Amino acid sequence: MDSVKIINAVKEARNSAKPRNFTQSVDLIINLKELDLSRPENRMKQQIVLPSGLGKEINIAVIAKGDLAAQAESMGLTVIRQEELEELGKNKKQAKKLANANQFFIAQADMMPIVGKSLGAVLGPRGKMPQPVPANANLKPLVERFGKTISINTRDKAFFQVYVGKESMSDEELAANIEAVLNTVARKYEKGLYHVKNAFTKLTMGASAPIEK
């Protein structure tokens, strides 16, 4: 889709939304067509790094011990050590609370078996199983990437709605993020954007603005 048309849709969405006393999110809605979504290979399930970032802070939890846990703490990240991890395995309510409070999880690789046993049933269905890293990993690049990442999982639905930024971002920044999502869809399918029936963008409290093909 043409970048100018995407920018025009962002402008229309912005103009149709009344001012609110909070910063509204901007979403992209895509309806798909002519895909057999009973076949897993036709479903969208992936992470996309948005070039303009998210326009907001996200929460990341690190399951680690020793030096990696200390590094995560120095970065201000939520740290879950082995003792706490084992306790979470016995307290499903707390485990769900943790899962909902954090967008991404990172785990020290040698702790993954305990993670699977303690949190797998909670994180798995949410698409939040941790990214495993070695004990001597530098967390900074991964944390920076997660800070620009959104997740899409259509399951068996022929549409998805995904966050692409905040209204405080410029039209060009939002358009670049939308284009990144559309390009990911185009690369996913052999016929590319042919499988996009239509696409819209909207602010939280605003009307949907169509993106012209």
UniProtKB/Swiss-Prot annotation:
Offer an example of a GO molecular function term for this protein: rRNA binding
- Establish whether keyword RNA-binding is in the entry: yes
The cross-references to InterPro entries, in alphabetical order and at most eight, read: Ribosomal_uL1, Ribosomal_uL1-like, Ribosomal_uL1/biogenesis, Ribosomal_uL1_3-a/b-sand, Ribosomal_uL1_arc, Ribosomal_uL1_CS
In Gene Ontology terms, what is a biological process of this protein?
A: translation
Q: How does it assemble?
A: Part of the 50S ribosomal subunit.
Instruction: Identify this protein by name.
Output: Large ribosomal subunit protein uL1
Xref: Pfam families: Ribosomal_L1
- Coiled-coil segments on the chain, per record: none
Q: Which UniProt keywords apply?
A: Repressor, Ribonucleoprotein, Ribosomal protein, RNA-binding, rRNA-binding, Translation regulation, tRNA-binding
Outline what the protein does. Binds directly to 23S rRNA. Probably involved in E site tRNA release. Protein L1 is also a translational repressor protein, it controls the translation of its operon by binding to its mRNA.
* UniProt KW rRNA-binding keyword: yes
Q: Which family does it belong to?
A: Belongs to the universal ribosomal protein uL1 family.
Entry's Gene Ontology cellular component terms: large ribosomal subunit
Organism of this sequence: Methanococcus voltae
